[in-house]
């Protein structure tokens, strides 16, 4: 049984044996396949966790039907992670079991809550089943989070006036001013 603090490496072993007649067999110190079992107690970590949107106005903005991409890089090979974006299961777009880099995507829906920033989770473990700490924050992402805004803007005030003595009329040389106030 492996114990915490044991050396992380290929596990050495020897097998000494005899047959029922007492003949000593050749000592075995390795698997006939040439493979080995490696002891690993180190918890994996994520060195990069970044998020972006495909919104044409910028990677930190999202609206309904925008695709959110979460990218991660681990410090060692990990099993395919479980990723949520805005509380929904994200589809793994790149990376396969036993790699260090993965991307996951989710298309924002009208049923998703507006958020600034969009929340996410990344659950992952290394190939030896050591659980990494759930990621809920960005790591080495220079842009910051993505804001999901699903509300269309509207004007709360729209007015027009001229600098004519009667501000509802205009003639050549008068300046017409339109004043708009938006809800966002």
Predicted regions and their residues:
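Structural beta-strand segments of beta-rich domains
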Residues: 66-70, 174-178
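Extracellular beta-sheet repeat scaffolds used for adhesion and glycan interaction
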Residues: 1-7, 11-14, 27-33, 55-60, ...
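Short acidic/polar inter-strand loop motif in beta-rich domains
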Residues: 19-24, 126-131
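Repeat-associated, polar segments at repeat-unit boundaries in modular proteins
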Residues: 17-19, 35-36
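Short proline/glycine-enriched turn/loop motifs at strand-loop junctions of beta-rich domains
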Residues: 73-80, 181-184
């Amino acid at each position: 049984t492996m114990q915490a603090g044991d050396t992380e490496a290929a596990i050495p072993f020897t097998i000494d044996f005899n047959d029922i007649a007492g003949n000593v067999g050749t000592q075995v110190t390795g698997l006939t396949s040439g493979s080995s079992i490696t002891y690993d107690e180190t918890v994996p970590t994520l060195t990069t966790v970044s998020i972006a949107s495909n919104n044409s106005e910028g990677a930190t903005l999202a609206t309904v039907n925008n695709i959110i991409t979460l990218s991660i890089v681990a410090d060692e090979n990990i099993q395919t992670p479980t990723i949520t974006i805005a509380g929904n299961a994200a589809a793994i777009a790149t990376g396969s079991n036993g790699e260090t880099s993965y991307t996951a995507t989710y298309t924002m829906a009208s049923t998703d809550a507006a958020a600034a920033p969009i929340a996410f989770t990344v659950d992952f473990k290394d190939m030896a089943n050591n659980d990494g700490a759930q990621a809920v924050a960005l790591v080495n992402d220079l842009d910051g989070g993505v804001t999901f805004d699903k509300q269309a803007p509207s004007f709360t005030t729209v007015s027009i006036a001229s600098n004519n003595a009667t501000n509802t009329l205009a003639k050549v040389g008068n300046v017409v001013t339109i004043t708009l106030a938006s809800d966002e």
